[in-house]
Amino acid sequence: MVSYWPVLIVLCLLPICHAKSYFADFVNGKGPFKQADALKFMDKMTILNKLQADILGIPQPDEFSALDFEDKIESKPDEIPYLFEGDMVLTDEQMDLIIKNVRDQYWARKSSTNEFLYAIRGKRSMTSFLSERWSFPVPYYIDTSSGVNTNAVLAGVAKWEQETCARFTRLNSYSSSSRQNALRFISGNGCYSNIGKVSRFPQDVSIGWGCTSLGTVCHEIGHALGFYHEQARYDRDDYVSILTQNIQDMYLSQFTKQSASSMVDYGVGYDYGSVMHYDQAAFSSTGGNTIATRDPNFQATIGQRVAPSFADVKRINFAYCNSTCSNYLDCQNGGYINPNDCNNCKCPPGFGGQLCDVAGTNSNGCGAGDITATSSIQTISASGALTCNYVIKAPVGAKVYFQMTAATFSRYSPCTTNYLEINYGRDFSRVGARFCASYPTISLSETNTLVVIYKGVNGARFSLNYRYDPVTFSTSAPTTTSTTTTTAPITVPTVSPTTTTTRQTTTTARTSTTTTTTQAPPTTTTSTSQCASWSACSAQCGGCGTQSRRCGTYVETVYCNTNPCTGGYCCRPFFYVTSFGTGYCRRPGADTPAAPQRYVEQRKG
């Protein structure tokens, strides 16, 4: 076992002993553990850290550093280095089980067969042990003598009661010897909580300095109700990558995965927008990201601490409230019967109505929320301090093509106060991709439904083009005769390596004229005598294709055929704009075609 007494001696020789020392408080029993339990817990954290290093295939980490603890807690009070995953107080039994599970993961990686068997056991994010679930109402006591922010605690409790069937009852007095399950809210060193109900005694939930936002209080209460962190789910590798090069090696244990058997999900998938998700730079040693989302469009979505997400609430309701309503409603789009109102469905963001089958209520100035996509480009836009919900429907069998053509938001990560959320996936119960500092790198929904949510403040705005895809999709009913009818696609003449752009302009005399210009691909410093001819463009319109040519040891490529496709659409990096009634494809930040991209051709053999 590792001894921490030498660390304490060094700590007390430093000037930090004359100020507040979180580490000294912790190992001296002034934190969430008694002194002996604190030292035992840190020994097990060291074991866990080394196991995690083995799993990740990196050198064995250094021992814990007390000085690092002080800076970390001051800057991020929900990332306490000597607690599991930064803010979780575990019992001895829970810690032993996690170490066992991490050992299982290590050996599973040694065998693809074992890894497969381990993987199919389930996808979970909440404690599966029924003994750790609460009975309602949950008694709680606010220890004002500790300096805890009473209003912050009450707001967090009220939020969970508003969204779920969970109920709490406030106690007027508290005894440390009371043999009663209860939550005691204190102002400790940082933010922390146990996982679920852990004993027949009151358990502490610390809402310390820097922990008083509604989302953070809800996060800690979420742990007490049984939540693990979202990025600790067994299936997290399908959704995020852990960037170990940016994690200080002594914090590797903060990125462990739970086993499938220790958590239960209730069919609610991985949610990037969960209030239980780490932010992108959690436990960073470099200031760089430690978590990268597999779909880069969700990078600015992870780590919000505003409020529980729809999926967070859904898990709690499924865990605790399934027997609340006896009636049946055909809830749509990921909605479910509201345990606080059994006559209506609880709807995911963007949706409303009794059955979640229409767009949610819009603020004045948003326009209609339920929209039907056609084969022609249409536009939605909004600006200012509004919340707008748009549900764009394409015909069944088609998809929704979209392009965000303009956006002005506060550039923060994660996107929390103002952003455009685009849910292009299949499961609308999970938060969509949020954009406040970037544009989407995707332009097609997975189904025939696209959900767009604008959350604005003064000065914010957005504009988004949409249509259904493909533009040749037939919306007519299929024929019942034995004759087979085939609709020929629209024929577009093959275009040579030179491209022609036609724009309509208006003179001062209000007469319309048409100007046609022909432009060859941009030239480079390489003599054209050294280059072969340009290849045919790989697509016929919309800047969707490229053409290439060989110039000595280089190959040059350039976008081509940037005239809009039928129905008015363009491929990335172009977007469709109109000028005086004529549409064309424009590349952001440029009014001329891009110079060819060059690379050295890799020859085989």
From Swiss-Prot:
Signal sequence segment: 1-19
The Enzyme Commission number assigned here is 3.4.24.-
Cofactor note from UniProt? Answer: Binds 1 zinc ion per subunit.
What region holds the Peptidase M12A domain? Answer: 124-322
Q: Which residues form the active site?
A: 220
Cellular-component GO terms for this entry? extracellular region
Between which residues do disulfide bridges form? 165-321, 191-211, 325-345, 347-356, 366-388, 415-436, 531-551, 537-560, 541-565
Instruction: Please give the residues making up the propeptide in this record.
Output: 20-124
Chain's role: Metalloprotease. Required for normal hatching and migration of neuroblasts. May act by degrading eggshell proteins at hatching.
Task: Report what the protein is called.
Answer: Zinc metalloproteinase nas-34
Q: What is the lineage of its organism?
A: Eukaryota, Metazoa, Ecdysozoa, Nematoda, Chromadorea
